[in-house]
Amino acid sequence: MGMRMMFTVFLLVVLATTVVSFMSGRASHGRNAAASDLIALTIKGCCSVPPCTANHPELCG
């Protein structure tokens, strides 16, 4: 393989790696948002139960 071909292969590998990491980063943002929503729902559930509210006043502010 010549230098030009090796450089082309290198660029293709870098491009593919960048695209994969970009897409996986975007996918994890969705999972993080879903986890945050679940945590918020759990806290709201706790705040509606008086014993839980008494035990965790910092959550229900």
From Swiss-Prot:
Expressed by the venom duct. It comes from Conus amadis (Amadis cone). GO terms for cellular component: extracellular region; host cell postsynaptic membrane. The modification Cysteine amide is found at residue 60. Residues 48-50 are annotated as: Ser-Xaa-Pro motif, crucial for potent interaction with nAChR. This is Alpha-conotoxine-like Am1.2. Belongs to the conotoxin A superfamily. Residues 22-44 form a propeptide. Transmembrane segments: none annotated. GO terms for molecular function: acetylcholine receptor inhibitor activity; toxin activity. The keyword Oxidoreductase does not apply. Keywords: Acetylcholine receptor inhibiting toxin, Amidation, Disulfide bond, Neurotoxin, Postsynaptic neurotoxin, Secreted, Signal, Toxin. Contains 2 disulfide bonds. The cysteine framework is I (CC-C-C). Alpha4/7 pattern.
